[in-house]
Amino acid sequence: MKTASPHIIQEGSVQYQLGELKGNQIIYDFPQMLIYLEAKGKLLFGKNFKIYSEDEAILYKLCIYFIRDFEACKKIGIDPNKGVLLSGPVGCGKTSLMKLLPHIVPHQNQHTVVPARNITFSFNKSGFKIIEDYGNNGFYCFDDLGVETIGRHFGKDCNVMGEILLSRYDLFLKRKLRTHATTNLN
């Protein structure tokens, strides 16, 4: 990716123009973004990846969030300065979307998708350092939040993800560092 053209993304021999550069601002084109997202989805998740028309409304909201279109976000009641909580039934593609969408803005800081249960397993092995590691820095999307077990380290029980989210909320208040999550819970 050339920094002079962050709206043009090269995947193999194909170039995807997601919008137009006007001055120092990118005017994104949602249909072009969908074309790119489907192509990138096939590269990341396999040839059967498909964006369905019924998913376009949520994709539009997520796209304007990720491209930081403050005006469009305001119109539909999204606060682009807060994190995303994406909920839905098992297998509907929440994790795939949170892994896919950052690719439309490769010039921005990217979050790391981490399964919440893996964090709890790490806590069981390594203890409270894990809460510190995830609670004090980094840009994360916690995947499948709410289905992880209670952590236990040397006989001491802990709601690991609850503690991490409290720490990350403090981080948000102090440094405006956003946290994303996916969940199957209502």
Regions from the PLM with identified roles:
Residues 97, 101:
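Hydrophobic positions on the alpha1 helix immediately C-terminal to the Walker A/P-loop
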Residues 91-94:
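Conserved glycine(s) of the Walker
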Residues 1-79:
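A short, basic N-terminal segment
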Residues 143-145:
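Walker B catalytic acidic pair
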Residues 86:
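Hydrophobic anchor at the beta1->P-loop junction of P-loop NTPases
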Residues 102-137, 152-158:
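Short glycine-rich substrate-engagement loop in P-loop NTPases that contacts/grips substrate
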